[in-house]
């Protein structure tokens, strides 16, 4: 998504430089921390002080154990359904690719992708006692209360995308409790709950996407992403990304 937003900045006359790795960073008025890892490595953190402004400079850990307010332990008294997820963003695929690259003693070549099995779909269990011991014993998994948004029209999921003060918040419908992009339909713009703005402040986000639901009038944040993807540009998305790009202005003051 940021690539599409940056195209608007360039059209406005801003110079945008994309830098890979943690060395040879140019001087800049604003730096955007855009590293697709759940936890930002120390070598990146050390370099941030050289810039006067760092977008997402405080959003250093987006693991489920940091983001979620619905984590469970095996001895909790929760009696409802639960869902098992990876603690790492996107099932830790990027971390596994990085580990492959290091084990091969070379970076991945342009266009080369390490074979990493996609993470299994979130698993829903009727109760805590149905969760296998292997999950509780794993540091890579978390167990959360399963709190879907559901009404007579089916299930819903909401996404709040923001850059500074520019934002859009959309709700999609779906027939399944675990909402997938291919099954999302009937998008509609909805207000951003104040509780979600508080979560953004807690997590230190300036730019990103929050996936959430409203369950029994309660806002439930289940994913926070500082490197969101985007569908192929269309007329409506181009306009939306141009609106998002306006959020840069507050960081240039």
Please provide the spans of the model-predicted regions.
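Short catalytic/ligand-binding loop motif for oxyanion handling, primarily in non-cytosolic enzymes
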Residues: 40-42, 64-65, 90-94, 151-154, ...
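Protein kinase-like catalytic core scaffold
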Residues: 82, 141, 168, 220-222
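A long amphipathic alpha-helix within ATP-dependent nucleotide-binding catalytic cores
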Residues: 146, 170-221, 225, 229, ...
């Amino acid at each position: 998504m940021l690539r599409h937003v940056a195209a608007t900045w360039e059209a406005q006359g801003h110079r945008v430089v994309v830098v890979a790795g943690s060395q040879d960073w140019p001087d800049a008025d604003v730096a955007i921390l855009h590293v697709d890892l759940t936890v930002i490595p120390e070598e990146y953190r050390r370099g941030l002080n050289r810039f006067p402004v760092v977008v997402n400079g405080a959003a250093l850990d987006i693991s489920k154990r940091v983001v979620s307010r619905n984590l469970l332990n095996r001895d909790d008294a929760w009696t409802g359904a639960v869902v098992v997820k990876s603690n790492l963003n996107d099932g830790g695929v990027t971390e596994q690719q990085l580990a492959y690259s290091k084990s091969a003693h070379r970076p991945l070549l342009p266009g080369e992708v390490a074979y990493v099995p996609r993470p299994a779909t979130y698993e829903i269990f009727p109760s805590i006692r149905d969760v296998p011991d292997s999950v509780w014993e794993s540091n890579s998994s978390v167990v959360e209360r399963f709190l879907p948004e559901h009404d007579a029209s089916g299930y819903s999921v909401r996404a709040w995308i923001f850059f500074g003060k520019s934002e859009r918040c959309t709700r999609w419908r779906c027939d399944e409790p675990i909402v997938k992009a291919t099954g999302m339909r009937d998008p509609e713009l909805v207000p951003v709950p104040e509780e979600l703005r508080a979560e953004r402040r807690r997590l230190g986000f300036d730019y990103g996407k929050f996936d959430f639901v409203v369950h029994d009038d309660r806002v439930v944040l289940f994913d926070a992403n500082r490197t969101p993807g985007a569908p192929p540009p269309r007329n409506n998305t181009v306009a939306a990304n141009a609106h998002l790009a306006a959020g840069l202005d507050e960081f240039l003051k």
